[in-house]
Amino acid sequence: MKIVFFGTPEFAVPTLEKLLLNQEFEVLAVVTQPDKRRERGNKLTPSPVKNMAIAHDLPVWQPERIKKDTETLNKLKQLDADAFVVVAYGQILSQKILDMPKLGCVNVHGSILPQYRGAAPIQWCLYNGETETGITTMLMDAGMDTGAMLLKATTPIGLLDNADDVAQRLSVIGGDLLIETLYKLQQQEIQPIPQDNAAATYASLIQKQDYGLDWSRSALQLHNQIRGFYPNCTTTFRNQPLKITASFPLGAAYNDELPPELQKMLQKLPDLSQISGSPGEVVSITKGVGAIAQTGEGLLLLREVQLPGKRPQSGWDFVNGTRLTVGEVLGNGS
């Protein structure tokens, strides 16, 4: 089967790799986003998909706006591909492109459709505290993730999973599911299922303001935000930004999901039942563990943080390095 692959980030690499390892498929070309400039050094950096394609001597096309790039459109048409495979490409494909391949354009989407259509399904799924997510393959149409569904695969989400953890798992699942989907499409063993638009939810592009932590929210809500938008959630500490990259909401309801090393750590904590403070206030510090902050509902353990210009560090190293004291308040420009 002749394939053209459209994809850009690390999430798309395992699917391309699975196609390249399978002799049933011939990847004719790879379409990816233009190289981007890094913040540091201002160097142009190729996408992970481009790196993989170059390593396998594949033609790579990087149109700025594929809808209006006549040269790319002509080259795609001339390839006469059986299917286009699209995994987190980052541009909307025109109907002209969608109509080119014989079997259609197959998209690998990081959610259980019709839930979490859109640009950031994994992040918003974690933000909302979902306990399961998955991959859906679908035949693309002109809408945003509205095409008929082909196959689905699910995976559980643990309370300590962050967006990177889930993305890595789903990227592998997606590669396997895509191969199965293409086989069954070719053999006409799949009946595409239209999505129920009434049941659809949307995962919009994440904005900078989504990273700000509001300490009046509950410990569980803040924890879900921190792991969903990992590693970018930010508060303030002594009038400078502080990223919180890992946390844990304290309470018996969550303890069953703890790995042994975290269970041992929490056994060092004092009785917290009588401790309280204002939202964002550091209410307890335990040697070898770190700081605990009051939230609008419940207490939040700061497991890992990152100061400006520094590497991420454990909660306890943060306490030691800054000489943090009980009573200091996070947020509110403090």
From Swiss-Prot:
Q: Which reaction does it catalyse?
A: L-methionyl-tRNA(fMet) + (6R)-10-formyltetrahydrofolate = N-formyl-L-methionyl-tRNA(fMet) + (6S)-5,6,7,8-tetrahydrofolate + H(+)
User: What Enzyme Commission number(s) apply to this enzyme?
Assistant: 2.1.2.9
An example Gene Ontology CC term for this record: cytosol
What GO molecular function annotation could you give as one example from this UniProt entry?
A: methionyl-tRNA formyltransferase activity
Any idea which positions bind (6S)-5,6,7,8-tetrahydrofolate? S111, I112, L113, P114
- What SUPFAM superfamilies does the record point to? FMT C-terminal domain-like, Formyltransferase
Question: Can you tell which superkingdom this protein's organism belongs to?
Answer: Bacteria
Keyword Lipoprotein included in the entry's annotation: no
Pfam entry (one): Formyl_trans_N
Per UniProt, which keywords does this protein have?
A: Protein biosynthesis, Transferase
Which protein family is it in?
Belongs to the Fmt family.
* Known function: Attaches a formyl group to the free amino group of methionyl-tRNA(fMet). The formyl group appears to play a dual role in the initiator identity of N-formylmethionyl-tRNA by promoting its recognition by IF2 and preventing the misappropriation of this tRNA by the elongation apparatus.
Query: What is the protein's name according to its record?
Result: Methionyl-tRNA formyltransferase
Q: What is the species of this protein?
A: Trichormus variabilis (strain ATCC 29413 / PCC 7937) (Anabaena variabilis)
Q: What would be the name of the gene that encodes this protein? A: fmt
